[in-house]
């Protein structure tokens, strides 16, 4: 089942949506509470974090899923056609149909954070295919991807998000299998690791392996992004033996940045492709495939708000925490948990202690949260 565990030596880890503290004059109580409320701000791409962080050091978070229980009760959700996914309680895996004739459909789990090119992150999972056919639509006779990876849900759920155009699917970091459709297609199959930036036009280079998956074999797919060298590395084993050892996708000079917030098993729509004949080849493609996925492990960087505490300083409420570089932090206050007011200027994280102070503290009650946003 999904989890955000800490290492045993860490002393504990609490992760939820908002970093909330309360002020009550004149007794100066300090309270912490959790909330499931979310604020959707697509363009700002912001999130807020809740609870009191008690880690003595920064530890990466991990999402795991082995499908021993119903994943829809463990944080997973479906966008699109629910019929493409079926939890198998006997085999304890997820049966998946990748059908490009349907609308974009995702079986996804929110990460609880926002990843960018300056983050280290990874995903590993098992993949077993029962069957697959590329070019199944005679009007779209070429190949099309079967994909698993990271996406930006707010963008990927828009009608104009089209993986097959080559420029209408921004903010992706994913593994894809392109089967060989035969016919006029001369390029064969491929396995790819790819990142697409926020413009949708700039892709990583490399990350390509000219192999095909086969049915009834168990593949362990690993994608590992390292910020220090701007590489997304793909490794794959087949039945516990090395199959693809080092597929490296590198960010080019034109690659801007990306923002991804969900891990997803993605069945993309074939809509929007160029169906014209180009020298005897129609490059527009389609796919129908069936298989199972299992044993997900997603590794994430430390949360952007750590070691949060709150206290009065000269009769003004002050939040103290460790922030991360490339995040912006703002202190917000509410009296009713419906409307929130910014009560501090935005401060940039730098990997050390940050202090946010309410310069206009209320006369009676006030509840606070720290909002962390990726600019």
Regions found by a protein language model. Name each.
Residues 56-60:
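Sec/Tat signal peptide C-region and signal peptidase I cleavage site
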Residues 63, 71-101:
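Extracellular glycan-recognition surfaces and repeat-rich motifs
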Residues 67, 125, 212-249:
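Carbohydrate-binding surfaces in secreted/extracellular proteins
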Residues 67, 287, 294-298:
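Extracellular beta-strand elements of beta-rich domains used
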Residues 98-194:
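Secretory/extracellular carbohydrate-interaction modules
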Residues 185-220:
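Short, aromatic/His-centered strand-loop micro-motif at the edge of beta-sheets
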Residues 248-288:
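Flexible glycan-contacting loops in extracellular carbohydrate-active proteins
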Residues 300-375:
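Short, composition-biased motifs enriched in small/polar/acidic residues
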